[in-house]
Amino acid sequence: SLLAAVSKKIEYYDDEELDQFIGKAGDAYTEEETEMFRDVLYTTLDVEVAGWVRSLQLRGIELPDDLKDEVFLIIGERRNIEVKKADDR
């Protein structure tokens, strides 16, 4: 379907350097490597974080374990904001 094709299109978030981590396990990152992900995370708009995570998944890049809580907190807060906006309409 068209939607499936669109959702599989890989979008980069100025993070091409993370491609070096394709296939690396989430618990195998060094502190410096985790910081590379953190730098991208905190220069990405909150509304784009879910798309960034999807991009990483499509590219075969696992998030560092140390960063997963931060990422899911941001995505969760963003969803709460979207739900509140919908409720206010």
What residue spans do the PLM features occupy?
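Membrane-proximal, non-transmembrane interface segments of integral membrane proteins
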Residues: S1-G51
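Cytosol-/stroma-facing membrane-proximal "stalk/adaptor" domains immediately downstream
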Residues: Y29-R89
